[in-house]
Amino acid sequence: MALHDFVKIDKSRFEDAVKAYFLWKELNALIKNSHNRGINFPETISETLLCAAMGFELNRGTGGDAREPKTQAIIESKATSNWDRDTTSFSPSENFDALYFLRLNQRDDELYIYNTGINSDDLKSIQVNKTQTLGDQQAQGRRPRFSVIKFIIEANDIEPVAKVELRTKKIIKL
């Protein structure tokens, strides 16, 4: 059974997430100076920023990353700090009502938020290789990996619904 601990993101939590973003960015740059690979964009930052921008409640328990308070919809979020590409994985037991994708433009410190219009059932039909769908791989107990940018955002011409300007701490609905 899923444990839920929903939190409304107030101004203080939003500002803490923005501060954490800039600390992550600085640490990531230091690490990339001596290693090929940087640090993944922390979900504690991306999920908080998503909730602040969209009015969702952050789930600090299990069973989805957030909740839409009016409809009780379970929100799953995935994020990338690489604007051009991503590799995302989903657990075999994913269950959500709406998938949101967060795409970070590090150069300009802007986070773009996309409502993919996809739920966990829709996700199962996405072709992840020549012979299998995401659902096929989940049924085998695997964590399928694919690009949300390529297979969902670009394939369906999805535009962002919001932008977070991290330098100015502005949230803009698009």
From Swiss-Prot:
InterPro entries: Restrct_endonuc_II_Bsp6I (IPR019037). GO terms for molecular function: type II site-specific deoxyribonuclease activity. Keywords: Endonuclease, Hydrolase, Nuclease, Plasmid, Restriction system. Its EC number is 3.1.21.4. It catalyses: Endonucleolytic cleavage of DNA to give specific double-stranded fragments with terminal 5'-phosphates. The keyword Protein transport does not apply. The keyword Cytoplasm does not apply. It holds the Pfam family RE_Bsp6I. One of its GO terms (biological process) is DNA restriction-modification system. Coiled coil: none annotated. This is Type II restriction enzyme Bsp6I.
